[in-house]
């Protein structure tokens, strides 16, 4: 689901909450377009690591905002996150995409570049994209400490998870 128009229709849309600046929103946008553009391994690698790890985390610690009492929000949330997780696996197994030797480390660098863009934006527009302004309002055992310490902890977790995903996916170690 490329565009979350339900927030526009039901009047919940605002710049502080609905720009596609959360990690899964960025991954979702990439997932919508990656199959329609010439083979781009950088986008694939970003989608593979950030999409799978981000969506996996979202499945286990969901935060569904603006729940309007219908099942649409739940369906949209879980179907979009499921698609973010399954598409890069399908691309790896069936479409000839490959993970390069240091792809896991490159994606960590890309994520930090994205962090450097999103963090100041959060303070400018009073938002919490990528949960960089304050911790998400969910029960998450991996949120350790207050801001900014939980972000530093997540930096370590992301490096470990991307490397583990690389080893599992390729069978290679570095």
Question: Across the structure, where does each feature detected by a protein language model lie?
Answer:
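Membrane-interface transmembrane-helix boundary segments in multi-pass integral membrane proteins
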Residues: 106-113, 123-162
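A contiguous pocket-lining binding segment that forms or flanks enzyme active sites
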Residues: 62-110
